């Protein structure tokens, strides 16, 4: 079945036929080969009919087309993008008209001579992007008219100078190549193109050497084209290139390819550095080297039967006339059953290396630790260093090679850099000082190579000691610093590299080059090493004695003052005298000096035939660390056990002569520096044990020894020491601890006693001390942190000999100092908030916003958390910031700025901002109060004579006392006013800062300045402690009461508190009748306003329960009351009442009946009809006669009684009542023994001060529940409303209404007597009590019961009139 036929339009058929005819008519011979032929339509030739352009590009031709097939007039031939490999001789013969030949992008590698013959008209030839390696002048024969030649992109690396000799018309040439080497082989290029008409194209760039890479060749000069420098080959490869692991018997071929540099270039093979030759018996077949395209040379090596011996490095070596180079590959030949080396982790001074599980016979490589500044390769990349480790055939790790890796320790790496530096006379002193600066930290050396590198540098510097005398001083200091290195590290350095022997040799020969006729003496001092050298004449030698000594520490005769180097006192020194003297170390004649060793050389030291000049040198070492016990004693192996050097080591040596064998012995005395027993005399034999050195007992004899000094007699010149047996369990070496001045310890103890007195008192008597909850917390924490700071300072500031303890002391001091300042700041904020909430703006009627409750934990997070964070960060960054190389346990200087001084300054600044704000609030409040008093005085209300005012006590006898002016003072929940609290806190901060500064100066300074600041510290500490304990304990009445309450006989001896308790201060001047008629019922006298501003409750409680308690309001002897009132009125000035009672209760301002939680804004009316029910009573009424008699006394002594029913309008005019809330922060009202004595109402308030909200209820605290206001009588409620609307209004009408209400109340009450109306009102409101001790007659039942155990409540438990003295 055939598909549908597609019909081609007729006109399309005609067009195709015409096209084919046209092609066939132009070049019919090329139609079968796929080439195309077109006419040349260039303007230069107006007759294009005879000129042809043939294009055979991209036709996959493998050779050039036959010339006979091309048109005769072919002017352009395109053979690009084919696969032509060779141009034969005469390939284009006959194309005499050809002007352009394009042969680019082929595979041409060979051009035979005469390939372009006959192309006399050729102008452009493109041979780019082929594989031409050899170019000769014969290749371009016949191209006489060629103007443009492009041979770029081929594989040649250089060109023959005569290559373009046949091209006479050449104008432009390009021969860029990726292998083009711009060296001496192309030195002809600049002159050739400069002298001829040809031009080198800009595309011709250099590829090699690297210094000329990508630079245009035409811009280079002949001097740039040189063959100097290392040989760089554009090609050098070895296959296989990676490490090969093969088994025994395998076949392994190698193929090496290299650049053909010159005619003598050759390839050779090596195995493990040994030449390899062809040996068929061993399976080694080596082929001859072959050259390719005049560019490459190759060689092949075949291992037909690999043996185990073939393991190792196989290397292909390229030898040229300009040098040799090579590449290699590692071959590992394994047995058929191979083992493995286990995985292993190694930590050393080069870093941490993890060697993996490796097959036996394999070398494993690990990258070195990358440092901050890695080295760069010549190519610009990062040079990756490696460590190697071989796993032997038995499956065991060999020693690794870490030489290419850098040291991880900074000091070690720097010392290694010094080793690599060249030393000469110009830089020797500079390098020596730099090395010496790094040896200052020798105590922290942890590697033996540190000691080794310093020893090697000292040996290098010895070559320049003669011309640079300063070097000897630096070398002695280097050796002295190295004696601080740990004993074990020095011992290992001696065993491994004999580093200690090298150092000792350098020091003991240091003076020889510097002694001559013009410099006959040399002395060098340091802390641990001292050297003395002399040029002597043996013929005149009479003996010499040299003593090593040092200054006593802190000697009075020391000349070292502030600013001088204190280490000069501890330097070792020599004192030499001529003649032989038996100098005793204990009787050393220099004042304030300690002799450590002495050596006496006899007069017969030199033989008779000694040379005329001789050099004598003494060297003393403070200890024997440079002379470790690397092995047993020479000749006395049994004495080497558990022995150590217990004395300094002193050396005596000669240069240029020797000791006479018949000389008298040398006498050496040495002082013991460590305990031990069984001493032996020894000298150091540097030649023993293969020049490692050892102590020898031959030649020295111990002639005397005691606890402190040993004397030796030796017959050889050497290093001398005394060896003692070390105990089996030696005690830890005692580290000297610097002791502060005794006044610091004494006065710190006084300060701690005072502070802990405060802390213990406020903790044990928490519920008895009237202080806000926040103030209680801040006071205890401030005291505790001040105690911590002073105790840690006195006990640990000088413990620098114990690094860990010293760091802990520094951290604790840092924390406690900042925390103390923060707690003082928190206290300042608390006072400021309290002052802010008592400003007149809120007292005059602004509605107080109910604050939200906030926990006390925030204070601890600020005052304790912030210092903890600062200290933690400081210690985490570098724990050595505390007590590192400083004589006290504190922060080092530079980190202390950001970690302590700046935060401390900010804390003090913020604290003083709070202080200033508090002062501003208090000044504003005092100004408003003075204005209120002036307003009250400008509109007085006349009191009738029948109402002599009882001042603040007037309202105590009425139920509307919540709106009466009962000494409306501030209800600060502290005995001190805000002003006193603020001033005390300022003084505390100032004295603490002074205490801290004096302590710091006492530690920092020395001698007299230290004593001065120690005394200042003691005085400041004592003053701070006394001030705090006086202010917070002795001057507080509640603290006194709490202390006295601890005495067993205090309650039984305390007098009745209710006999004479004057109440409040009357504003203005009172008449005699008014003062004499005042009746004070169980209230306290007003005193100095700055002294008493107690609240009706304590805020230090944790309870949230509000219990209403009152003080005993019992009336006792009325006559006594009248007499006391008359006496008080006569003694006290107008407006002031003075207390005369000795009871503690009388010294506390209380408020007997005024509810402290009474709001004025919403006065509530409530009928007071509750009565106290019957209960157990201890006292009963004694009859109406006695009560009637008391009533007469009351009338006779009290005058009119209506004044007691209500205050005047003047007293009401300037009183502000603010609702008081109990909260979890400021404490709750509670029924406790401590509060029973003071009751719920405060009588001791200042005139004109409102019942301000405590700071605890401010923004820092919240209400836990509002108290319900006490109910008021109707007249009282109306009067309260009138007081809010008009402050300066007469209250006489209100007083009459209040009296009437009181009279009705008295009739209703259970008063035992039927008195007249004017007396009944007073008594019924004040003295009616129930058998259970509750006052009745007011709208609130007030509890007056108490026990003997109560501190402040010594009230009666019966009715008011019982148990009274009858007058």
UniProtKB/Swiss-Prot annotation:
Low complexity bias (residue ranges): 1136-1156
GO MF: G protein-coupled receptor activity
Keywords: Angiogenesis, Cell membrane, Disulfide bond, G-protein coupled receptor, Glycoprotein, Immunoglobulin domain, Leucine-rich repeat, Membrane, Neurogenesis, Receptor, Repeat, Signal, Transducer, Transmembrane, Transmembrane helix, Wnt signaling pathway
Signal sequence annotation: 1-26
Residue stretches of each LRR repeat: 70-94, 95-118, 119-142, 144-166
Record gene name: adgra2
Assembly notes: Interacts with reck.
Disordered as annotated region, ranges: 938-958, 1126-1156, 1221-1271, 1339-1367
Alphabetized InterPro entries for the sequence: Adhesion_GPCR_A (IPR051963), Cys-rich_flank_reg_C (IPR000483), GAIN_B (IPR057244), GAIN_dom_sf (IPR046338), GPCR_2-like_7TM (IPR017981), GPCR_2_extracell_dom_sf (IPR036445), GPCR_2_extracellular_dom (IPR001879), GPCR_2_secretin-like (IPR000832)
Membrane topology: Multi-pass membrane protein
Ig-like domain ranges (all copies): 230-332
Descriptive protein name: Adhesion G protein-coupled receptor A2
UniProt keyword annotation of Zinc-finger present: no
Transmembrane segments: 743-763, 784-804, 810-830, 859-879, 897-917, 983-1003, 1012-1032
SUPFAM superfamilies on file: Hormone receptor domain, Immunoglobulin, L domain-like
């Amino acid at each position: 079945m055939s598909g549908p036929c597609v019909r081609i339009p007729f006109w399309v058929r005609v067009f195709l036929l015409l096209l084919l005819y046209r092609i066939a008519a132009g070049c019919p011979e090329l139609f079968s080969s796929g080439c195309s032929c077109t006419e040349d339509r260039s303007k230069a030739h107006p007759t294009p009919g005879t000129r042809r352009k043939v294009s055979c590009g991209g036709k996959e031709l493998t050779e050039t087309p036959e010339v006979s097939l091309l048109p005769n007039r072919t002017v352009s031939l395109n053979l690009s993008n084919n696969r032509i490999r060779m141009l034969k001789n005469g390939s284009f013969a006959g194309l005499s008209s050809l002007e352009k030949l394009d042969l680019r992008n082929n595979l041409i590698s060979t051009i035979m001579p005469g390939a372009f013959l006959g192309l006399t008209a050729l102008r452009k030839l493109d041979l780019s992007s082929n594989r031409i390696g050899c170019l000769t002048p014969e290749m371009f024969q016949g191209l006489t008219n060629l103007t443009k030649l492009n041979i770029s992109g081929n594989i040649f690396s250089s060109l023959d100078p005569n290559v373009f000799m046949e091209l006479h018309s050449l104008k432009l040439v390009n021969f860029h190549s990726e292998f083009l080497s711009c060296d001496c082989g192309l030195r002809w290029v600049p002159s050739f193109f400069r002298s001829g008409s040809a031009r080198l194209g800009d595309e011709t760039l250099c590829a090699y050497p690297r210094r000329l890479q990508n630079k245009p060749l035409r811009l280079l000069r002949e001097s740039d084209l040189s063959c100097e420098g290392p040989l760089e080959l554009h090609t050098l490869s070895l296959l296989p290139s990676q490490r090969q692991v093969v088994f025994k018997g395998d076949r392994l071929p190698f193929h090496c390819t290299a650049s053909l540099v010159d005619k003598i270039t050759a390839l050779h093979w090596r195995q493990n550095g040994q030449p390899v030759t062809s040996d068929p018996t061993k399976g080694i077949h080596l082929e001859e080297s072959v050259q390719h395209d005049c560019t490459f040379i190759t060689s092949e090596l075949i291992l037909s039967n690999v043996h185990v011996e073939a393991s190792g490095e196989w290397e292909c070596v390229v030898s040229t006339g300009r040098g040799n180079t090579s590449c290699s590959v590692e071959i590992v030949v394994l047995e058929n059953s191979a083992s493995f080396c286990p995985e292993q982790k190694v930590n050393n001074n080069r870093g941490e290396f993890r060697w993996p599980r490796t097959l036996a016979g394999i070398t494993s490589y690990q990258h070195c630790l990358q440092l901050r500044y890695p080295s760069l390769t010549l190519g610009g990349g990062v040079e990756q260093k490696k460590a190697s480790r071989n796993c032997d055939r038995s499956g065991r790790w060999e020693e690794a090679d870490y030489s290419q890796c850098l040291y991880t320790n900074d000091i070690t790496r720097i010392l290694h850099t010094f080793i690599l530096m060249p030393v000469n006379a110009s830089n020797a002193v500079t390098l020596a000082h730099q090395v010496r600066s790094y040896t200052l930290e020798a105590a922290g050396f942890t590697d033996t190579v540190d000691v080794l590198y310093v020893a090697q540098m000292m040996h290098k510097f010895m070559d320049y000691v003669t011309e640079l005398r300063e070097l000897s001083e630096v070398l002695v200091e280097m050796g002295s610093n190295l004696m601080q290195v740990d004993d074990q590290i020095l011992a290992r350095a001696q065993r491994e590299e004999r580093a200690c022997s090298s150092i000792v040799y350098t020091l003991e020969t240091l003076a020889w080059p510097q002694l001559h006729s013009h410099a006959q003496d040399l002395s060098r001092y340091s802390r641990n090493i001292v050297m003395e050298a002399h040029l002597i004449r043996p013929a005149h030698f009479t003996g010499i004695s040299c003593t090593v000594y040092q200054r006593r520490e802190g000697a009075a005769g020391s000349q070292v003052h502030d600013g001088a180097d204190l280490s000069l006192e501890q330097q070792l020194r020599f004192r030499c005298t001529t003649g032989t003297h038996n100098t005793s170390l204990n009787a050393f004649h220099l004042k304030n000096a300690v002799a450590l060793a002495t050596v006496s050389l006899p007069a017969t030291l030199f033989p008779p035939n000694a040379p005329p000049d001789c050099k004598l040198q003494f060297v003393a070492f403070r200890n024997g660390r440079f002379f470790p016990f690397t092995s047993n004693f020479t000749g006395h192996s049994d004495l080497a056990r558990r022995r150590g050097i217990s004395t300094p080591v002193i050396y005596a040596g000669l240069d240029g002569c020797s000791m006479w064998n018949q000389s008298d012995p040398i006498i050496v005395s040495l002082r013991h520096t460590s305990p031990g027993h069984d001493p032996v005399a020894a000298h150091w034999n540097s030649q023993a044990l293969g020049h490692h050195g050892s102590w020898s007992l031959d030649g020295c004899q111990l002639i005397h020894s005691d606890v402190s000094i040993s004397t030796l007699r030796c017959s050889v010149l050497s290093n001398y020491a005394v060896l003692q047996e070390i105990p089996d369990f030696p005690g830890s070496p005692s580290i000297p601890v610097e002791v502060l001045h005794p006044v610091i310890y004494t006065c710190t103890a006084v300060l701690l006693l005072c502070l802990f007195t405060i802390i213990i008192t406020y903790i044990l008597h928490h519920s008895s001390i009237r202080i806000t909850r926040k103030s209680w917390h801040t006071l205890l924490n401030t005291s505790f942190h001040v105690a911590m700071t002073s105790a840690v300072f006195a006990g640990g500031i000088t413990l620098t000999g114990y690094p860990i303890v010293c760091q802990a002391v520094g951290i604790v001091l840092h924390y406690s100092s900042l925390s103390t300042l923060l707690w003082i700041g928190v206290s300042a904020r608390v006072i400021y908030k309290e002052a802010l909430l008592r400003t007149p703006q809120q007292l005059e009627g602004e509605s107080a916003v109910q604050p939200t409750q906030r926990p006390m934990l925030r204070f601890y997070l600020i005052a304790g958390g912030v210092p903890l964070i600062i200290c933690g960060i400081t210690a985490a960054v570098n724990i050595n910031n505390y007590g590192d190389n400083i004589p006290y346990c504190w922060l080092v200087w530079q980190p202390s700025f950001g970690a302590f001084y700046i935060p401390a300054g900010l804390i003090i600044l913020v604290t003083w901002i709070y202080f200033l704000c508090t002062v501003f609030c208090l000044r504003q409040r005092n100004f408003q109060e003075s204005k209120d008093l002036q307003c009250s005085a400008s509109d007085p209300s006349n009191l009738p004579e029948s109402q002599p005012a009882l001042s603040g006590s007037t309202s105590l006898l009425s139920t509307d006392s919540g709106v009466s002016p009962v000494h409306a003072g501030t209800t600060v929940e502290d005995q001190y006013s805000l002003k006193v609290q603020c001033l005390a806190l300022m003084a505390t901060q100032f004295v603490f800062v002074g205490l801290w500064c004096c302590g710091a100066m006492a530690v920092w300074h020395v001698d007299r300045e230290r004593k001065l600041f120690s005394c200042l510290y003691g005085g400041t500490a004592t003053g701070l402690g006394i001030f705090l304990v006086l202010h917070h304990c002795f001057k507080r009445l509640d603290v006194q009461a709490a202390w006295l309450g601890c005495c067993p006989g205090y309650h039984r001896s305390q007098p009745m508190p209710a006999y004479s308790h004057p109440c409040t201060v009357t504003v203005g001047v009172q008449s005699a009748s008014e003062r004499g008629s005042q009746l004070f019922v169980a209230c306290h006298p007003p005193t100095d306003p700055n002294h008493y501003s107690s609240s009706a409750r304590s805020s230090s409680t944790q309870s949230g329960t509000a219990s209403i308690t009152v003080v005993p309001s019992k009336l006792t002897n009325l006559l006594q009351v009248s007499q006391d009132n008359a006496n008080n009125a006569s003694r006290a000035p107008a407006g002031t009442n003075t207390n005369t009672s000795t009871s503690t209760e009388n010294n506390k301002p209380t408020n007997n009946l005024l509810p402290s939680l009474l709001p004025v804004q919403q006065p509530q009316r409530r009928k007071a009809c509750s009565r106290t029910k019957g209960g157990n009573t201890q006292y009963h009424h004694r009859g109406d006669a006695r009560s009637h008699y008391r009533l007469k006394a009351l009338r006779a002594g009290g005058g009119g009684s209506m004044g007691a029913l209500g205050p005047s309008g003047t007293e009401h005019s300037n009183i502000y009542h603010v609702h008081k809330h109990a909260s979890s922060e400021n404490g709750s009202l509670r029924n406790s023994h401590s509060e029973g004595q003071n009751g719920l109402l405060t009588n001791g308030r200042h005139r004109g001060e409102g019942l301000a909200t405590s700071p605890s209820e401010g923004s820092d605290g919240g209400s836990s529940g509002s108290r319900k206001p006490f109910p008021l009588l109707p007249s009282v409620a109306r009067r309260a409303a009138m007081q809010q609307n008009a402050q300066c209004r007469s209250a006489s009408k209100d007083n009459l209404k209040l009296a009437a209400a009181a009279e009705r109340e008295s009739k209703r009450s259970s008063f035992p007597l039927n008195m007249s109306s004017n007396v009944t009102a007073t008594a019924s409101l004040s003295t009616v009590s129930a058998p259970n001790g509750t006052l009745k007659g007011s709208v609130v039942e007030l509890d007056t019961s108490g026990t003997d155990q109560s501190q402040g409540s010594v009230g009666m438990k019966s009715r008011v009139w019982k148990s009274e003295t009858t007058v």
